[in-house]
Amino acid sequence: MARGQLYIISAPSGAGKTSLVSALLKEDKLAQVSISHTTRQVRPGEQDGVNYFFISREEFLAQAQAGDFLEHAEVFGNFYGTSQAWVESTLAKGVDVILEIDWQGAQQVRKLRPEAKSIFILPPSLEALQQRLESRGQDSAEVIQRRLQEAANEISHYPEYDYLVFNDDFDHALEELKSVFRAERLRLSVQQVRFEAELRGMLSSQSS
């Protein structure tokens, strides 16, 4: 069985990353979003091991100290991390693992997993991004401006990624995202493992 591929997907807030990944997973049964470990409280409707692995702050810090996380960060006083063991066991089953992380997390992962493929999703423009953030109706004008500044910083790191997807049209962007996954699964190193018996049979019949 061919191993799964590790993917990093990053985007500025409001670029449509979560919606694109959700749409991808509805059609692609060989991919899964990483389930992070976190120290924050469980919210209504969430399940341990489904949405997150909920652990104590002490457990998290001990695991981080032991090097158990591919990447980890503190967000609004809570810790979030990606378990190396969970990622490895999922990849070993032939399932692709998607890490939805920012550029800083991506840099951490690349140091430990240089074979990871990374995809950056862009909005058509900062103006379009501002319109999307405003249309949500969730944030004040001040928060939106801060998010736009953060987005500009995030976008400046796009050259660090392997693939670039412009989300100016959702369906087109989704097709491009799916194309990346299809192309990676057709790489020689993957196909050699997947069709090992068939290839061996063809070559042995030639030599006999």
UniProtKB/Swiss-Prot annotation:
Keywords: ATP-binding, Cytoplasm, Kinase, Nucleotide-binding, Transferase. The keyword Cytoplasm applies. GO terms for molecular function: ATP binding; guanylate kinase activity. It catalyses: GMP + ATP = GDP + ADP. It holds the Pfam family Guanylate_kin. ATP binds at A11, P12, S13, G14, A15, G16, K17, T18. It is an enzyme of class 2 (transferase). Its EC number is 2.7.4.8. NCBIfam families: guanyl_kin. Belongs to the guanylate kinase family. This is Guanylate kinase. It comes from Hahella chejuensis (strain KCTC 2396). The lineage of its organism: Bacteria, Pseudomonadati, Pseudomonadota, Gammaproteobacteria, Oceanospirillales.
